[in-house]
Design a protein with these regions (language model features):
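Short microdomains enriched in Cys/His and/or Lys/Arg
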Residues: 16-32
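Canonical Radical SAM [4Fe-4S] cluster-binding loop centered on the CxxxCxxC motif
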Residues: 1-20
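Short acidic/His/Gly/Ser-rich catalytic and metal-binding motifs that mark active-site loops
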Residues: 172-176
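Conserved AdoMet/S-adenosylmethionine-binding subsite of the radical SAM
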Residues: 27, 31-42, 47-171
């Protein structure tokens, strides 16, 4: 898990508050709110990591597109590598770049960078618009050298429409 996950309360799929819902039922609920989305709104699939529930995600994305709902995927790009079909139904990717080097990525997440790298390659190949997000964590991702390297890395990507540097915060830390 990422060192600075802001919602560990969502990890359990069996807790007392866990609810199972079909993609069909979800999109039916979402469709009721379509008038509130306006011209620029829609649905954002986030997590945790939405790519870890790829079958549900794909069905929900397809149903959203059939209902005329704009779709956004908020992800760190960690899944099984079968991204093309999911991205066919994704209007915008909010890409959380945890780190831009293999070593740094492993330090932040404890995971291999390859899945995220493959996801980014597919996003670029499919030319899906992308907003980059990066959490600036004191002592971890806030150094000048790191930020310069991140800038160079982001400049190597295409179809990036926006870059957001997000401040690290400790809101909710008392809960965990």
């Amino acid at each position: 898990r990422c060192q600075y996950c802001h919602n560990p309360d969502t990890w359990s799929l069996t807790g007392k508050d866990a609810q199972h819902i079909s993609a069909e039922a979800l999109v039916k609920k979402l469709s009721r709110f379509k008038p509130y989305y306006g011209d620029r709104g829609g649905v954002t699939f986030s997590g945790g990591e939405p790519l870890l529930e790829k079958d549900f995600l794909l069905e929900a994305l397809i149903r959203c597109k059939q209902a005329g709902i704009h779709t956004c995927l908020d992800t760190a790009g960690c899944g099984d590598g079968d991204y093309g079909e999911i991205l066919r139904y994704t209007d915008l990717v909010l890409m959380d770049i945890k780190h831009y080097t293999e070593e740094g990525y492993r330090k932040v997440t404890g995971m291999d960078f390859e899945a995220s790298r493959r996801f980014l390659e597919t996003v670029q190949q499919m030319n899906v618009p992308m907003w980059i997000r990066h959490v600036v964590v004191p002592g971890l991702t806030d150094g000048e050298t790191h930020l310069e390297g991140l800038k160079t890395y982001i400049q190597s990507l295409k179809n990036v429409e926006r870059v957001e540097l997000l401040p690290y915060h400790v809101l909710g830390v008392h809960k965990y």
